[in-house]
Structure formats: structure tokens, C-alpha cells
Amino acid sequence: MTPVIRPTNDKTFAETLIRHNMAAYHQQLGWHWDYALFEQQWRELESFKLLINATPVGVLCLHQEDDAYHIRELQIAPPWQRQGLGTAALHFAEAHARQAGIHRLRLRVFSINPAMDLYERMGFRVLNTEDAVHAMERCIV
């Protein structure tokens, strides 16, 4: 399934989806949602909404750093997971980075998150692990 991916400033949709998708990980790891941090980071991100038939089904948030695009959020609504939307979003992020002359994608993911399989399949490699979070990177050729 191929989503339409468009720029968005729909902070409410993004926050709701992120909080919902991350709640179990936060609870399991004893983490808490930091609204102030989300507010601050939201203003710094290039954010995109994934749509299927005009229905919002996911969010992708990117931040350009010195030599890499950092995928700060890639969230897909549960009913739409495992249907290729995450893969489509990663391809979009790669094209976006390449267009900007950037040749690395980076992300951080909970080590217990099943999305690890997707990231590894897409060529991301673990750089380091701290506090149950993997820092991963993929070089874009």
C-alpha cells in the first residue's frame, strides 16, 4: 500500500499518535511523556502526514543535522501497521535527504520495539545502545 505523504503542521494528530504508539514502551521502561520537550522539538522538525484515501494514518518527522537527516518520529496508526507504510515513509525520508545532498539517515528506537526488524531490513545498523534505546544509521548511496 502506498500512502500520500504531505507536509503537515497538525501537531495534535502527531502528538496523539506518538503518545498512543509509545505508551506501552514508556510504561514498560518507566518513562513519562514530556509535553514541553515535544512542544520544543515539534517547532524544529520537518513533519509529514501519511494519508490513505485522505485518511491520516501516520506521521514522519525529520530533522536535518550536520551530515545526516535524523528520523525523529515514524509512527503508523495500529490498524495500518505491517502494510508497507513504514517502508514507504523510509523511502520518502531517503529521497528527501538525497534531494538535500545528505547521505545518511539516523534514528533512535527502543530496543524492544518490533520496528527494529523494519529498520534492519532497510539497511540501518546499530551504532550504540544507551538506556534501552538503539541509535541506528543508514548510509544512502
What spans do the regions from the language model cover?
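Conserved N-terminal entry element of GNAT/NAT acetyltransferase domains
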Residues: 1-11, 139-141
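Conserved GNAT-fold acetyl-CoA-binding loop/helix
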Residues: 9, 15-41, 45
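C-terminal "cap" of GNAT-fold acetyltransferases
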Residues: 39, 65, 101-116, 120-141
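Cytosolic beta-strand hydrophobic patch enriched in CBS
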Residues: 47-53
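Conserved acetyl-CoA-binding loop-helix of GNAT-fold acetyltransferases
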Residues: 76, 82-95, 120-121
